[in-house]
Amino acid sequence: MAAAAAVLALLPSFGTEVRAETGSAGISAPAPKPNKGEMRTIKKRMHRSFLPGKPSDAVVAELMKEIGTDGSFSDVDYSSEEFNSGGEKRKHLANLAKLARAYETPGGTYYKNRDLYNAIASALAYWVENNYEDPNWWHRIIGFPKDMMVTVVLLNDDMKRYDKELYRKCTDYLLYSWSVPKQRAQEGANGTDICKFTFAAAVITENETLLREVIEKVNSLVRIAAGDREEGIQPDYSFAQHNGSGRQLYLGTYGREYIDGVLYFMEFVAGTSFELAPEKVALFEEFFLEGVAWGWYKNEMDLNLCGRGLLRDNTGPSFVALTQRLAALGTPRKEALEGVIAMMKGNRELNGNKMYWRMDYMVHRPKGAMVVSRMTSTRTVGNEAGNGEGLDNYHTGDGANYVKVHGNEYTPILAGWNWKRIPGTTVIEDTRKMPAPMWGEGGAGGSDFAGGVSDGRNGVCGFIYAKDSLEARKSWFYFDDYYVALGAGINSQRGDAPAKTTVNQTLLAGKVALADASGAASDLAGAGNTSPFSRLWHNDVGYRFEAGSAPAAEIYKSGKRDVLCISFDHGTGRQGGSYVYAVYPAVGRGDFFGRTGEDYRVLANTPQVQAVQDVRTGRTMAVFYEAGSVQADGLGALSADKPCFLIAEGSGGAVKVTVADPYGEKRTQESVSVTVEGKSTAVPFRNGGSSAQL
């Protein structure tokens, strides 16, 4: 076995006497005398945090046997230089972390075993000597040092004692990313990741100056994004990452890493002079309450929030644990966070409606369900592809409309479902291979018009779809316990393949019941309907269709699972196509088919305006694609002089209107004039919507 003091490759020195390059913000003088008491407290916390997970003695013995005389592991392939081959090389660092835990766990067979130490030191020396790179920059800048951090922190005291040179080179390795101004400037999850191992190096070297620089950077990362493409927490408390081609929802993966990174620092520095600023803690809590909580339902993150990782395990114990960690810190809104935890565990419901205007994304949470609408504009993109994942994500931002009651409606069938039939979308269904939206490229919408408005309980959203020789005006009207979906101006230039609107493509779970215009209900037999139907019920979701609209219901396989697909076929080369349907989440079969009378009226469904009124409350919602007017019971003529989203409720002299513009930061108008029953008022356009009384 090679000695730990083997000749090591030269790396830039970024230890306790780091000197910055010209133009760098690095450390230019020896660090001042550290606050040793606090530093040691943080160091003990880190050590304790990294220690759990000691492997069995048999695993330790086997790993020691696999270390060659040069310090490499026989089960790791170090030779590949292909893109993402770093994933294989990271096994070296994972093995080291296992051995380090065995070495540092009191009472274990290998606790402070010198042979084990020598084996670890040899493998560490091998790693820093070779200083592996990868065509994917992430591995050397983030992945490798993040993995290596565990071993270096656990063994740092003994390395200082036995191998000072190895110790120095290991800490230099951890500090390399911080030395590169471009990498130190990373935002979002990548930014917190780089701070993690830089922080670890600062703590074990007792470099208080560097430690405060890292904490300052973390404070700067807990902020509301300002620029159009800035990553991280957005002004509406959504989370975005990989925004090169447009803002991209990414709470489920990168957001999770970002949250873990911020909590990492909050936990380690709690009660010390290094704590995050109070206003940063308050913002972070608000992000949990207004962002994280709304994207979660029945132990799973919304698919829209998972980026290219749609097919990964997106179930959510990790998010429960993250929220519990924040609440455990005793922050000012601990009680509200405990309410989120109760919701995540299924002991409480989160109800209401929220429009994430920054991301063209609406969440509706009626009693017993969660429904979402994901649109895109020239400002936003759908789920990306990259690193071999998400290759079928082309249509994920084209009106995806997922409805969940039980929580498992989609995940079991994703691997084999039809990606040209994403629920809510209107697309050309052909046999051509879809382009992969690599890192978001090609995933943006074809129009500036997209968005919505919410009053906190109800909401309306919509967009102009323009892609692949197909255009459509699409909107969703969310009322308390149902929603209406409208499509108009469906114009296709493709004569070789039909345009289709998918109402839902969902896991088949039990019987599918159909009712004709007379109201007589029967179970679907075979693989699809053979006669018209006006209502359909399945798995506690009801669907209602307009007379003569001719929806189709079919059952097919996705792997070993059966799938129910409900859709409209608009035909080839269609001009002026449209659709209307309503969806009732969380309703039993008997209650749905026993529902009599009309719940809503479609006031308009044209390329100029789409509007729906709830019969019970009189609440009226509209999408004006241009200046226009609709007639609504109790309100008379309801008009707007500019494109907008609008909610109107009340009657007589007490009508409240809530509006939002459809152009986000690209808007050129500051207000819209709304007229109700002959009375007009100018309502300002504000991000997130604004209200006025008429």
PLM regions and their residue ranges:
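N-terminal export signals
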Residues: M1-E17
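C-terminal segment of N-terminal export signals and the immediately downstream linker at the start
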Residues: F14-R40
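N-terminal mature-domain "stem" immediately C-terminal to a signal peptide or N-terminal signal-anchor/transmembrane
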Residues: P30-Y78
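A generic structural motif
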Residues: N35, I233-Q234, L514-A520, A682-N687
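Aromatic-lined, polymer-binding surfaces characteristic
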Residues: A61-R308, R312
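Extended polysaccharide-engagement surfaces of secreted carbohydrate-active enzymes
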Residues: Y258, F265-V655, D661-Q669
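C-terminal beta-strand-rich structural cap/linker in extracellular carbohydrate-active enzymes
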Residues: R358, G577-A582, V683-L694
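C-terminal accessory/interaction regions of large nucleic acid-associated machines
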Residues: Q631, L635-L638, Y663-Q693
